[in-house]
């Protein structure tokens, strides 16, 4: 009798287990096949506004960061369940370690009627699936009311006992958006808000070029979890993802991995991925070419973002990766190492480069225009920031009388210093002009032969023509347009060519004809050609003299213009400093 009762109890327990499993399977299949009434309008709005449901349908990205106290198993996998949907992760190799760093992401749809998310951990033994434990997460209490928490620990329980702990992060995504991009934007927003509270953020000027170039901090502060990703400008996306890339990472330099500070920064309108030796170096606004090409432990490394081709993960070690980029048609590689966030960093760099390429392909001209504006602003800041009084914090502590004394002292020093500089520059320019004149006289003497100088002295008509040229140069001096000075030289040569009066004077000049007859080359040219253009071409003396006169006049004009510009700049700097 005892044996039969024992056997009957075994069958009864098996039947109860099978029946309960069957009932659960039927209910689960019914929920998955048959939709809930709240999935359709207007019932979904009725359920929401009457208070039966606490939230609308949305998409949730669950990021599994870390598992603690899972050293009993070699390999596990995770299944995330809701009432209708489930998602299975890849196999995770634990190798019997106490702490595992992961980057498993699960994108799942949360309906209005869903109340709980179940996260189940499984392992395999030969062909058998073994359940490790389960995590139950209340959607309203643990996720929505806490504004989608990040890096929060949850306890995995089986049969009322704690098995392990899992660190999770939750992100609200959109239907037609990339989940990873939404994740980086939300992380960047949290980092930016923390920085704005501490006051360490750097304000970027607004350039009203296009809506995708909006980088105003006030508009950035209006972005939240529910903001449509299409309403965020591309510059704002780049700015937020750059905050995500700001972290410490190991970089391989020659023979070892060295800890450096990674930072994505816009310098003079171009984005660079910087690996800095010291965190304080991120305020620099110049990039040295040697830091792009050379790999040195004691030097910063700067990589242009648009030159990054791909990032390859090492097959032997999942914590190492190689960044392959080009510069001046040559390939370079940089090895990075991270135990916790390697895949997170790789995805952030790839999404950043893709958004930057889209911005350049779609708005190339506007991007160049913005770059020019930033370069002009930086040059103006350098000019305006050379001479400042004291910091605003120091000014508040000073009394008014001392503040006035300091200001007057700096103003007097600036005025005297600027006047001295302007005077010295003006006298230096005068000395240079005199030296240039003397050099021109010497070159003219070397070029002109002794016979040609005698002909110039005896030729009164040519001197009259040179005087007329001087009158023309005086007219050019009164002309304010500098670009027309070069054109007037050609006009003057054309006037000399077309001047019939000069040809008649040369024909009627008996002295010059006697001198030209003695010269066989000049008599043949005058007899065969009555046009003065051929005379000017063949007569090297006249053309050289006229050209030298024009060169001298142009040099004198340029010296006058430079002296005027220097004096004007000195006045402008004085007015700026006084303001």
Curated annotation (Swiss-Prot):
Positions of the C2 domain: 52-84
Region 12 X 10 AA tandem repeat of Q-T-E-I-[K/N]-N-D-[H/N/I][I/N]: start-end pairs: 442-561
Protein's cellular compartments: Cytoplasmic vesicle, Secretory vesicle, Rhoptry membrane; Cell membrane; Host cell membrane
Mode of membrane association: Peripheral membrane protein
Keyword terms: Cell membrane, Cytoplasmic vesicle, Host cell membrane, Host membrane, Membrane, Repeat
A GO term from the CC aspect: cytoplasmic vesicle
Gene ablation phenotype (knockout): Impairs merozoite invasion of host erythrocytes at, or prior to, the formation of the tight junction. Merozoite development and egress following schizont rupture are not affected. Inhibits rhoptry bulb RAP1 processing but not secretion of rhoptry neck proteins RH4 and RON4. Causes defects in rhoptry morphology which are narrower and more elongated. No defect in microneme secretion.
Biotechnology remark: Antibodies against CERLI2 severely reduces parasitemia, suggesting that CERLI2 is a potential vaccine candidate.
Record carries keyword Amino-acid biosynthesis: no
Function recorded in the entry: Plays an important role in rhoptry physiology and thus is essential for merozoite invasion of host erythrocytes.
Name recorded for this polypeptide: Rhoptry surface protein CERLI2
Organism ancestry: Eukaryota, Sar, Alveolata, Apicomplexa, Aconoidasida
């Amino acid at each position: 009798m005892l044996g039969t009762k024992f056997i009957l109890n075994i069958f009864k327990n098996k039947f109860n287990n099978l029946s309960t499993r069957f009932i659960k399977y039927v209910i689960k299949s019914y929920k998955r096949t048959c939709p809930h009434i709240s999935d359709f309008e207007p019932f979904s709005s009725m359920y929401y506004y009457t208070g039966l449901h606490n939230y609308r349908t949305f998409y949730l990205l669950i990021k599994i960061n870390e598992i603690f106290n899972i050293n009993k198993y070699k390999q596990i996998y995770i299944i995330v369940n809701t009432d209708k949907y489930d998602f299975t992760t890849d196999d995770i190799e634990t190798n019997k370690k106490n702490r595992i760093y992961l980057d498993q992401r699960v994108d799942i749809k949360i309906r209005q009627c869903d109340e709980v998310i179940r996260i189940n951990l499984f392992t395999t033994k030969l062909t058998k699936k073994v359940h490790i434990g389960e995590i139950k997460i209340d959607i309203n209490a643990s996720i929505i009311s806490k504004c989608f928490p990040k890096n929060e620990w949850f306890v995995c329980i089986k049969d009322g006992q704690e098995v392990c702990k899992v660190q999770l992060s939750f992100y609200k995504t959109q239907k037609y958006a990339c989940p990873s991009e939404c994740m980086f934007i939300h992380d960047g927003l949290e980092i930016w808000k923390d920085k704005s509270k501490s006051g360490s953020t750097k304000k970027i000027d607004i350039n009203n070029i296009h809506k995708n170039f909006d980088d105003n901090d006030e508009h950035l502060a209006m972005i939240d979890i529910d903001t449509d990703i299409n309403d965020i400008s591309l510059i704002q996306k780049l700015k937020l993802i750059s905050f995500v890339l700001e972290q410490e990472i190991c970089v391989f330099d020659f023979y070892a991995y060295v800890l450096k500070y990674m930072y994505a920064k816009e310098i003079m309108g171009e984005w660079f991925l910087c690996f800095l030796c010291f965190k304080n170096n991120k305020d620099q606004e110049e990039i040295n070419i040697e830091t792009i090409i050379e790999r040195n432990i004691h030097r910063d490394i700067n990589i242009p973002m648009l030159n990054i081709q791909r990032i390859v993960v090492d097959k032997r070690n999942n914590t190492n990766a190689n960044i392959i980029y080009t510069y001046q048609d040559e390939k370079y590689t940089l090895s990075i190492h991270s135990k916790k966030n390697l895949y997170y960093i790789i995805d952030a760099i790839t999404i950043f480069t893709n958004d930057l390429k889209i911005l350049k392909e779609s708005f190339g001209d506007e991007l160049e225009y913005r770059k020019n504006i930033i370069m002009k602003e930086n040059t103006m800041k350098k000019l305006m920031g050379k001479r400042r009084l004291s910091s605003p914090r120091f000014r508040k502590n000073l009394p008014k009388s001392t503040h006035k004394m300091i200001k007057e002292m700096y103003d007097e020093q600036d005025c005297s210093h600027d006047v001295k500089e302007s005077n010295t520059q003006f006298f230096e320019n005068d000395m240079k002009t005199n030296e240039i004149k003397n050099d021109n006289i010497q070159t003219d003497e070397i070029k002109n032969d002794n016979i040609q100088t005698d002909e110039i002295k005896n030729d009164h008509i040519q001197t009259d023509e040179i005087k007329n040229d001087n009158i023309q140069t005086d007219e050019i001096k009164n002309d304010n347009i500098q670009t027309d000075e070069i054109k007037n030289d050609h006009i003057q040569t054309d006037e000399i060519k077309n001047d019939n009066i000069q040809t008649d004077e040369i024909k009627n000049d008996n002295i010059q004809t006697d001198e030209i007859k003695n010269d066989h080359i000049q008599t043949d040219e005058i007899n065969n050609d009555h046009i003065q253009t051929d005379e000017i071409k063949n007569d090297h003396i006249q053309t050289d003299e006229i050209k030298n006169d024009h060169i001298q006049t142009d040099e004198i004009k340029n010296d006058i213009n430079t002296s005027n510009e220097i004096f004007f700049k000195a006045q402008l700097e004085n007015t700026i400093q006084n303001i």
